[in-house]
Each structure stands twice: as C-alpha cells, then as structure tokens.
C-alpha cells in the first residue's frame, strides 16, 4: 500500500512539470492576445479622437472665416503725349480696395484721369532740369577727378586729395534741389487729391443671392 502511494506521488510529480511548462506558454499567448487587443482599441480610440479634432478644427476655421481681410492697390502715373504743345502732363490714378468679411465682399474702385495741374507740370519740369544738371555736374566732376589723379595710372584708384571739394559741393547742392522738388511734388499730390470717379460694390456669397450695389459718389474736392 505504501509503495502504491509513493508511485502515485511520483506520477503526479512527473506530470506537474509538464503542466508548469504549458502554463507559461498559455499565459504568454493570453498576454499577447490581450496586448494586441488593447493597443488595437487604443489605436481606434486615437483615430476617433483625431477625426473629431480635425472636424472641430474645420468648424473653428469656418467660424473664424468671419474675420475681415482687406487689400489696397494704388497706381499713379504721369505721362506726356506726342503732338501736344509744350510738355503737358496727364495724370492717371487707380485705387482698388477690397474687404472680405465672411461671405460678404465689399469692393471700392477709385479712378481718376485728366490733365495734371499746372503745379505738377512746373514741379516735374524742375525735376527734369535737376536731373539733367546732376548728369552734367557728375560727368564734369568725374572727368576732373580723373584728370587730377596723379597716381591713377599706377595704382588704379583715387584718393581723397584728388577730389575737388568745390565741384563735390556743387553736385550735392543739385541733389538737394532735386530732393526738394520731389518732396514738393509729393505734398502737392497729397494736398490736391482730386476724386473724380468712385465705384462701390457690395456682394454676398450665399445661396439667397443678394443684389450688388454700385454708386457714383464723392464729387471733386480740392484743398
């Protein structure tokens, strides 16, 4: 009887290691299956969160589309035409302003043309004379500097002692005169702004379709 019990114990002992050998593998398989399902669930949840975030971002961008955006383009030209007596100047100005606020677009076009005022003609004539004088003075100064450059043929450069200060001051005076004429012309242009044609356009980008409005306004103004 005792021998039989020992034999059974040995048999149970010999079977236990096999069960122990199987249990880690089964636990490992269960763990891997749980890990895969867990991370798969996390990935699905993250994907759903990303989709919700992108959708909310698009909604926010649509709502924030109501912010105003404006742009302005201004072009002004002075031209002379062949066949006219004297140096008559023609002034053309074009200004376009556009403001976008959500689905609404407001556009303003300002255009003017015609003969430039006599003050502009006098100013531009003075500018042309100064430009010609600068060219003449500059050429004369450069020529005299090269003539007086003692070491020019040997060194290839000029020194400060080779510059005639009187001619240099004369050139600077002409440049100052030209700058003054440009400033005068700019002040006259700003002060004597002449608004002749102004068009306003207002439109809505929607399904109901609001009509656009245009009006001619702002009569001539002179300061």
Swiss-Prot record:
Signal peptide: none annotated. Residues 51-61 have a biased composition (Polar residues). The modification Phosphoserine is found at residue 43. The keyword Phosphoprotein applies. Residues 1-37, 49-73, 196-223 are annotated as: Disordered. It comes from Homo sapiens. InterPro entries: C10orf62 (IPR037649). Residues 1-11, 202-223 have a biased composition (Basic residues). The gene is C10orf62. Residues 12-37 have a biased composition (Basic and acidic residues). This is Uncharacterized protein C10orf62.
């Amino acid at each position: 009887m005792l021998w039989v019990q020992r034999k059974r114990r040995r048999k149970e002992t010999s079977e236990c290691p096999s069960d122990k050998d199987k249990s880690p593998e089964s636990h490992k398989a269960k763990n891997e299956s749980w890990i895969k399902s867990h991370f798969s669930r996390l990935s699905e949840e993250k994907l759903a969160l990303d989709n919700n975030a992108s959708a909310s971002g698009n909604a926010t961008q649509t709502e924030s589309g109501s912010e105003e955006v404006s742009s302005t383009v201004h072009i002004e030209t002075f031209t002379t035409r062949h066949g006219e007596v004297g140096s008559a100047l023609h002034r053309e100005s074009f200004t376009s302003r556009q403001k976008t606020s959500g689905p609404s677009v407001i556009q303003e076009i300002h255009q003017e043309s015609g003969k430039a005022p006599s003050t502009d003609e006098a100013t531009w004539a003075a500018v042309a004379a100064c430009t010609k004088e600068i060219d003449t003075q500059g050429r004369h100064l450069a020529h005299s500097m090269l003539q007086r450059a003692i070491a020019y043929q040997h060194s290839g450069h000029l020194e400060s002692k080779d510059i005639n200060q009187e001619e240099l001051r004369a050139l600077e005076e002409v440049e100052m005169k030209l700058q003054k004429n440009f400033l005068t012309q700019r002040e006259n242009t700003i002060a004597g702004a002449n608004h002749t044609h102004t068009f306003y356009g207002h439109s809505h980008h929607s399904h109901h379709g609001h009509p656009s409005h245009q009006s001619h306004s702002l009569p001539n103004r002179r300061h």
